[in-house]
Amino acid sequence: MSDQQLDQHELQQEENKLIAQRKEKLAAVREARAIAFPNDFRRDAYFADLQKQYADKTKEELEAAAIPVKVAGRIMLNRGSFIVLQDSSERLQVYVNRKTLPEETLAEIKTWDLGDIIGAEGVLARSGKGDLYVDMTSVRLLTKSLRPLPDKHHGLTDTEQRYRQRYVDLMVNEETRHTFRVRSQVIAHIRRFLSERGFLEVETPMLQTIPGGAAAKPFETHHNALDMAMFLRIAPELYLKRLVVGGFEKVFEINRNFRNEGVSTRHNPEFTMLEFYQAYADYEDNMDLTEELFRELAQSVLGTTDVPYGDKVFHFGEPFVRLSVFDSILKYNPEITAADLNDVEKARAIAKKAGAKVLGHEGLGKLQVMIFEELVEHKLEQPHFITRYPFEVSPLARRNDEDPSVTDRFELFIGGREIANAYSELNDAEDQAERFMLQVKEKDAGDDEAMHYDADFINALEYGMPPTAGEGIGIDRLVMLLTNSPSIRDVILFPHMRPQA
């Protein structure tokens, strides 16, 4: 057994000992009273609200007012005379007043452990140091914690353990709680932003018979009653566009997508996506709308449009750079010429040298995107709209009027990561059918991420879809930016993990 394994074994033995002691205390509670886990305590204040409401009250003013409160929380520190509680908003001290609390209560308090949840009544007071606290007149145990909290000096520092036991991480790490409060604020702000502009929030199927709307590998399942294969959706796009056909001209959805692909600091098999569509608009309108949304979000969440991330600062207050795929390759790789990019064999050689997985059947547009992904994407630090994607890799996007070999599409990159994907939607049913057929050929040639042929979607387009612009924004990656989080697992409450050995 290694030293590390020995240390782990000793720690586990110590934890088991503490758990056994706590179970003995719970047994004593069960014996002493009929209900060991009562549910009749009603608090009337959160700690943060008390701190804010009475911030300007002096010690003398609080003594004179004798403001009664009922509070509840988890014991995080026990200093003898003062117990530090934590609720969902803040921490606050409660004072163990030996003059007012009954002897039996004082005796019971001595048996309480860190992690126990208590309810207390008393009056607000302020210490000589200026700290607000509750001078308790009564207190009781509401929930006995059977497992000890992480060591107060080291906390929960093992990253993988934080992800696996997020409930403990949330208990002991204020930074984690802040991250998920920000996530909630971001989603709420997006909903307000779009609703105020006339968008209708909708819900579309998670289980689909044909996985469409993105180039990705789906999760497959089986519907027993219908005896048919079904797929967890990889994107809601084709259903949202059906709604535009039906007459809902501005729609959005914030929900989960599922992709049966790799796990990394940027990828989780289950992730949250915003998709929105607006009729009588194009992809340039969406660029303007996206810039406005991102500036508002940063200002709302951070109080500034300068977004710190690692050792960099992203400037959301400045106009986002707009470059085509083709021009971005030339800008960031001066050794590559336009002639190189327009020659299939030269482009294939560049893509291979850059490390792309070249199968041999790719067209020029696909090769250009491969080169972009390998040689440009990671260099796009400040916000960049990369536009005019080749039609081969944009099967649902409208062709550009001036150059039909590219589409009216953009992807937004910040910090070298794709944050959003948008385009003027293809509403020509015959063109869409042809592109689906090309995707089927790609799939037959070995491209697992190529799209299926969706006959019902073609049927919908044949009724006529107005000129439309659509966009998808990855909520998880956006929250990573706004919370300075290095991994997507930091912003997903319960990320998927490999099984423990």
UniProtKB/Swiss-Prot annotation:
Binding site for Mg(2+) 1: E411, E418
Catalysed conversion reaction: tRNA(Lys) + L-lysine + ATP = L-lysyl-tRNA(Lys) + AMP + diphosphate
Keyword field contains Cytoplasm: yes
Primary location group: cytoplasm
UniProt xrefs under InterPro entries: Aa-tRNA-synt_II, aa-tRNA-synth_II, aa-tRNA-synth_II/BPL/LPL, Lys-tRNA-ligase_II, Lys-tRNA-ligase_II_N, Lys-tRNA-synth_II_C, NA-bd_OB-fold, NA-bd_OB_tRNA
Subcellular location: Cytoplasm
Subunit structure, interactors included: Homodimer.
Protein name: Lysine--tRNA ligase
Species lineage: Bacteria, Pseudomonadati, Pseudomonadota, Gammaproteobacteria, Pseudomonadales
Gene: lysS
